[in-house]
C-alpha cells in the first residue's frame, strides 16, 4: 500500500467525518433557520462530493497512473464541490435576490466544465483531453474568483448592517467570514498548481484539509449562535430590497446572543 493511496484514504475519511459532523450539528441548534439549513446541506453535499472524488481516485488509480489523469478527475469534481461551498456561504450572507444570479452563474460554469470534458473525450477518445484540461482549469478559477468577489461584497454590506443595527457580539460571524474567504482564496491560489503535481499534493494537501476543518468548525459555531429575534433585522433589510427589486425571498441573521 503506497503513500499516495494512504493519503487519499485519509482524505476520504476526513471528508466523510466532516460531512457527518456538519449534518449532525443540526440536532444541537437552539433555533432552526431555513436559510442556514439550506447552506448546511450544501456544505454536507460538497464534503460528500469531495469524499467520492477520493474513492474514485483510489478505485481507478487515476492519480497513481498519471498526474494529468488525476488533474482531470480533480477539476471535474472540485468545480461543483467548491461552487456548492461558495453558494452556501453566499446564501447566508445575502438577503437579496442576487442568490439567484449567483446560482445561475455557478451552474453555468459547472455545465461548461462538464461540456468541455465531454467534448475533450469525444475528440481524443481518452481522458487525456489536452487543451480541454486547461480550459477546465480556467473555468474552475473563474468559479472560485467569482464566488470570492460576490461573497466579499456581501460580507462588507452585512457587517455594516450588523454594526449599525445589532447590539450583539460579532465575533462568531467575523470568524466565520474570515474562514470562508480564506478557504476560497487558498483554494484559488493552490489548486491550479497542486493538482498537476503529486509531490506538491503531499505538502499542500494537509494544509487544505486544515483550512476546510476550520471553516466547518466556524460554520457550525455560527449556526449555534443564531437567535430568532435577530431575524427582524434581515426582514427590515428584505423589505427595503423588495421595494428596489420586486423579488421575494426569506432570510435570517446569525449573531451571538448578548
Where are these regions (language model features)?
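Membrane-water interface of transmembrane alpha-helices
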Residues: 19-25, 81, 145-159
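The cytoplasmic-loop to transmembrane-helix boundary for the fourth helix
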Residues: 90-120, 131-140, 166-183
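Alpha-helical transmembrane segments and their immediate juxtamembrane interface regions
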Residues: 90-99, 208-234
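Extracellular-loop-to-transmembrane junctions of the mid-late helices
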Residues: 2-15, 115-153, 191-205
Amino acid at each position: 500500500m503506497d503513500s499516495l493511496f494512504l493519503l487519499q484514504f485519509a482524505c476520504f475519511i476526513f471528508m466523510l467525518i466532516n460531512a457527518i459532523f456538519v449534518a449532525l450539528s443540526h440536532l444541537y441548534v437552539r433555533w432552526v433557520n431555513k436559510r442556514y439549513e439550506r447552506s448546511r446541506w450544501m456544505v454536507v453535499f460538497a464534503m460528500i462530493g469531495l469524499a467520492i472524488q477520493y474513492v474514485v481516485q483510489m478505485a481507478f488509480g487515476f492519480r497513481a497512473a498519471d498526474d494529468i489523469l488525476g488533474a482531470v478527475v480533480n477539476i471535474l469534481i472540485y468545480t461543483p464541490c467548491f461552487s456548492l461551498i461558495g453558494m452556501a456561504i453566499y446564501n447566508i450572507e445575502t438577503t437579496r435576490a442576487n442568490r439567484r444570479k449567483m446560482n445561475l452563474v455557478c451552474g453555468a460554469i459547472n455545465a461548461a466544465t462538464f461540456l468541455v470534458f465531454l467534448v475533450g473525450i469525444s475528440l481524443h477518445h481518452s481522458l487525456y483531453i489536452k487543451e480541454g484540461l486547461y480550459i477546465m482549469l480556467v473555468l474552475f478559477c473563474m468559479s472560485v474568483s467569482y464566488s470570492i468577489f460576490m461573497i466579499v461584497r456581501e460580507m462588507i454590506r452585512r457587517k455594516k448592517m450588523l454594526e449599525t443595527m445589532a447590539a450583539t457580539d460579532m465575533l462568531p460571524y467575523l470568524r466565520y467570514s474570515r474562514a470562508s474567504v480564506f478557504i476560497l482564496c487558498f483554494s484559488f491560489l493552490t489548486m491550479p498548481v497542486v493538482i498537476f503535481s503529486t509531490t506538491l499534493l503531499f505538502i499542500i494537501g494537509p494544509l487544505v484539509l486544515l483550512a476546510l476543518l476550520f471553516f466547518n468548525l466556524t460554520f457550525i459555531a455560527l449556526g449555534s449562535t443564531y437567535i430568532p429575534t435577530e431575524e427582524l433585522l434581515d426582514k427590515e433589510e428584505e423589505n427595503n430590497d423588495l421595494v428596489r427589486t420586486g423579488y421575494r425571498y426569506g432570510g435570517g441573521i446569525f449573531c451571538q446572543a448578548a
